[in-house]
Amino acid sequence: PRGSPRINARRAVNLLQSLSVEEMASRREAAELAIRELGISFTVYTERGNIDRAWPFDIIPRVIPAKEWAKVSKGLTQRSRALNLFINDIYNEQKILKDGVVPAEIVLDSPNYKSQCQGVSPTHGVWAHICGTDLVRNIDGKFYVLEDNLRVPSGVSYMVENREITKRVLPELFENYSILPVDDYPSQLYQTLASLSPRDRKRPCIVVLTPGIFNSAYFEHAFLAQGMGAELVEGSDLFVDDDDCVYMRTVDGPVRVDVVYRRIDEDFMDPEAFREDSVLGVAGLMRSWKAGKVA
């Protein structure tokens, strides 16, 4: 009320108010320097060429109470399950179309509907293992979903790095709050991907498939590969052999790949199944996936 900070944000506001204008400017400069040192950037595509930009950083943190976040997290988990059930139904029994809940033409005439996936049942029945859900807080104070990105969600590395920079420039915040960690994301991602391996191995071979250094999210591709201890590869580094298995080219010879974390659009991932002119993907990747030889 009357512009006073919410209870959960009060300590953060008090800390910021205790800093002079000069101190705030100094800490902001420290944050910008850290971003440059860490090489945190993204690419802006323009008609005149591609421009690398430093990641914009807001020094003022957003404070979300644990109880509120637990509710949001529960809702997002439920939403992710519902979306996966929907996709699995679309590519198999299509009950939701037959029952008229969703008009068939909306789905089947969509350019995002891939008939090549019809009849496939992936491991755990999960199609979208990583969901990028954009949230907004409305004027009523509640969180709403703006959109779901299930195809090639991007941006999580910036979240992890934002937290690291905040620790550097506002360490006092972490003395006053009990804050949920985010730096374990790469290990959580690794566990998720490892659970999909078609082979029962203690440490399956996982690769991150990137379009290359000129992609706007290349920083993230490299960040996640390094964090998981996975190989960062381009399409030319992989091939599908006569046994329908995916192999990675190495100096010691071919190495079988168990899981491909795809960071390229599906239209470009396999010229054998999708766009024939694609030079970014791996010919036969869909065939290998359908045969259960790779995830």
Give residue spans per PLM region.
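Preference for protein termini
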Residues: 1-295
